[in-house]
């Protein structure tokens, strides 16, 4: 599929930056989408959930606040809906090369529960039926739901099983545009970037459970009988002081006085009350010292895992052919834009700087202005709301009076 970018000379999407020109020379771009005119001919809206009247519609827009009104993406537009849309590109394999998957996403709705991730799919897919059960190769991007889920998903499919990344990668939660980038390399290492800043990195071997572990604890190993795991022992030189056991736990209160009105004949013989003995230290225990024979906690030695079989193509996705969005949103308003699938991280970085990088300050200013207007409108509406509440309270008082009147009438009727 040909790269799709605007031909408008004034657009920020023009490749005018030197770094981008340099990147173009070396980069192989498999797919690129900025949702310019004609985008609907390149994307297929799924009919998934349509029969249940739960399929959400997409808007082609730059959003309520933006850094360039001409830079449009696709935005979810209906609450409590499922969304599924995909685009096809010429099938390719990332064997022997980097795989870079990048896109921008903005949650204008102050998202409290919903996804902002995208998927790469392999093989042949019926795009009209693309949905939650459609197998995918990579799922990547932010996911937010309540206070517990605010993270970046990086799910890789290996041997028909979806594997979640084991590391936590927090996502952005504000209402501005952010760029998410996933880089997968031939040496089985990866990086996750947000706004061109690396947030996580590592290896496919350690950060996903794609393969069995290389080593395991030796199941036949036994702890030696003379293995000493006690870090501290009683001091053999410490001796109990003479008379220690004779110290009473309580003593007579030396400050206690017999009450003047105490009558021994009537009250019995007066006995001074007891109090805790400050000299009493409890049962004697010898001091603890470092155990000279301490060997630490015993652990079974590691051995090669007989079930481990290395896969030099662990990073390879051989038949990548589609990119799509499939998600559920309680509150709509998420906007996707500037999708790039290529083999050069520098090219993706340059695209991010040419779009998000040049627009972010203007977008933030537009957002702050929109928030200011919203707060002013809410402030103006507050007195009217207060008057309405007073009217409601008056109505409630009237209703209560009517209810009491009706209650009295009922009581009077019962008496008759």
From Swiss-Prot:
Glycans are attached at residues 59, 159. An alpha-D-glucoside binds at residues 117, 119, 136, 143, 326. PROSITE patterns: CALRETICULIN_1, CALRETICULIN_2, CALRETICULIN_REPEAT, ER_TARGET. The keyword Cell cycle does not apply. Residues 1-27 form the signal peptide. A motif (Prevents secretion from ER) lies at residues 413-416. Its main location: endoplasmic reticulum. It holds the Pfam family Calreticulin. Gene3D superfamilies: 2.60.120.200, Calreticulin/calnexin, P domain. Transmembrane segments: none annotated. Coiled coil: none annotated. Residues 199-264 are annotated as: 4 X approximate repeats. GO terms for biological process: ERAD pathway; protein folding. Residues 215-286, 355-416 are annotated as: Disordered. Molecular calcium-binding chaperone promoting folding, oligomeric assembly and quality control in the ER via the calreticulin/calnexin cycle. This lectin may interact transiently with almost all of the monoglucosylated glycoproteins that are synthesized in the ER. This is Calreticulin. It comes from Nicotiana plumbaginifolia. The gene is CAL1.
């Amino acid at each position: 599929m040909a790269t799709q970018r605007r031909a408008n000379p004034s657009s920020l999407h023009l490749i005018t930056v030197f770094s981008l020109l340099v990147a173009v020379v070396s980069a192989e771009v498999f797919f690129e989408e900025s949702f310019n005119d004609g985008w609907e001919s390149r994307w297929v809206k799924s009919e998934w959930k349509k029969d249940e009247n739960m399929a959400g519609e997409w808007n082609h827009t730059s959003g309520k606040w933006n850094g360039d009104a001409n830079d449009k993406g696709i935005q979810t537009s209906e609450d409590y809906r499922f969304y599924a849309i995909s685009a096809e590109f010429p099938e390719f394999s990332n064997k022997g090369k980097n795989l870079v998957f990048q896109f921008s996403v903005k949650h204008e709705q102050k998202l409290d529960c919903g996804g902002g991730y995208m998927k790469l799919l392999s093989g042949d897919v019926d795009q009209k039926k693309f949905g939650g059960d459609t197998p995918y190769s990579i799922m990547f991007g932010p996911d937010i739901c309540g206070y517990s889920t605010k993270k970046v998903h990086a799910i890789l499919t290996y041997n028909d099983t979806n594997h979640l990344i084991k590391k936590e990668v927090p996502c952005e939660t504000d209402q501005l545009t952010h760029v998410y980038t996933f880089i997968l390399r031939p040496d089985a290492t990866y990086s996750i970037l947000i706004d061109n800043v690396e947030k996580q990195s590592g290896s496919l071997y350690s950060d996903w459970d794609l393969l069995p572990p290389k080593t395991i604890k030796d199941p036949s190993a036994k702890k030696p009988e003379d293995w000493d795991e006690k870090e501290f022992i009683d001091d053999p030189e410490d001796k109990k002081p003479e008379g220690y056991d004779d110290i009473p736990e309580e003593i007579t209160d030396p400050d206690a006085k017999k009450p003047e009105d105490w009558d021994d004949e009537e009250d019995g013989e007066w006995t001074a009350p007891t109090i805790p003995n400050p000299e009493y230290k409890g049962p004697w225990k010898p001091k603890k010292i470092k155990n000279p024979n301490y060997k630490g906690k015993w652990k079974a030695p590691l051995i090669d895992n007989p079930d481990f079989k290395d896969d030099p193509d662990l990073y390879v996705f051989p038949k990548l052919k589609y990119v799509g969005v499939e998600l559920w949103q309680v509150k709509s308003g998420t906007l996707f834009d500037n999708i790039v699938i290529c083999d050069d991280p520098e090219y993706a970085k340059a695209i991010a700087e040419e779009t998000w990088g040049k627009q972010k300050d203007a977008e933030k200013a537009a957002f702050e202005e929109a928030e200011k207007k919203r707060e002013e409108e809410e402030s103006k509406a507050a007195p009217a709301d207060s008057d309405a509440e007073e009217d409601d309270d008056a109505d409630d008082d009237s209703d209560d009076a009517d209810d009491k009147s009706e209650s009295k009438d009922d009581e009077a009727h019962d008496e008759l």
